[in-house]
């Protein structure tokens, strides 16, 4: 019994952490924890999860209890990894495997799910920025300018992620860089509409997934977790606006 109890504790700690980091909803993370624990005949499960921390207390039929706490310091959206983790949780519930199998599976998911390389990310960033600039009414030249700035933006984002710069400061820097280059391009004649070029790139920074997940968390009853994620999305939005305002003040773009 205690062996199965340790299995459940180990799985919950690693599995839920990977899910939350990959962009899973709070309710989905907690539901997976409870299902896995039930598969290992855990008598009582108390789970508390927010965007930056997770706590789970497990109690077996003999009264033994284990509390696992994990601090979450980074978030990103990785749907491939999330799909594999969800599939693994279903296998765990069906088969109740030993600890070595679970550890190996989680390690394989971590190693086998790799990010796209930087050139591909820059290419996609350029295509998205250019497409949005034209979609919102910009000329073809505005789209080209937005695409070039999109490459620069991705390089800045990549650098801030590698150096682990504070999220709010990183968004201020990214927004300021995007807006400054956009103003400079238009002044040099490489583009017609500053706002369209800026909008095309700002769309890459908007925390749409975080905002959507926060609303879903609140609807599902996780008010605290939803509010924290909502506040995080609002702070990111304010940081983006701050970067634009600084650039506009320097280049005299406010009110034009």
PLM region spans:
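Soluble N-terminal domains of membrane-associated systems
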Residues: 1-97
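Alpha-helical transmembrane segments and their cytosolic membrane-interface
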Residues: 74-128, 133-142, 232-241, 252
């Amino acid at each position: 019994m205690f062996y199965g109890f340790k299995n459940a504790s180990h799985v919950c700690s690693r599995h839920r952490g990977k899910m939350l980091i990959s962009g899973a909803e709070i309710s989905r993370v907690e539901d997976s924890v409870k299902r896995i624990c039930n598969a290992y005949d855990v008598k009582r499960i108390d789970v508390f999860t927010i965007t930056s921390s997770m706590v789970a207390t497990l109690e077996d039929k003999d009264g033994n209890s284990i509390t696992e706490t994990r601090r979450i310091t980074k978030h990103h959206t990785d749907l491939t990894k999330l799909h594999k983790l969800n599939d693994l949780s279903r296998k765990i519930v069906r088969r109740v495997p030993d600890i070595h199998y679970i550890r190996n599976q989680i390690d394989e998911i971590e190693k086998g799910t790799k990010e796209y390389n930087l050139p591909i990310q820059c290419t996609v960033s350029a295509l998205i920025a250019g497409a949005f600039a034209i979609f919102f009414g910009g000329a073809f030249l505005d789209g080209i300018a937005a695409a070039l700035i999109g490459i620069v933006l991705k390089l800045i984002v990549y650098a801030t992620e590698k150096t682990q710069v504070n999220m709010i400061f990183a968004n201020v820097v990214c927004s300021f860089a995007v807006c400054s280059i956009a103003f400079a391009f238009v002044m040099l004649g490489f583009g017609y509409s500053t706002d369209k070029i800026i909008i095309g790139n700002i769309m890459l920074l908007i925390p749409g997934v975080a905002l959507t997940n926060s609303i879903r968390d609140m609807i599902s009853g996780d008010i605290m977790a939803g509010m924290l994620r909502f506040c995080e999305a609002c702070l990111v939005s304010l940081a983006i606006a701050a970067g634009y305002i600084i650039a506009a003040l320097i280049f005299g773009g406010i009110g034009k």
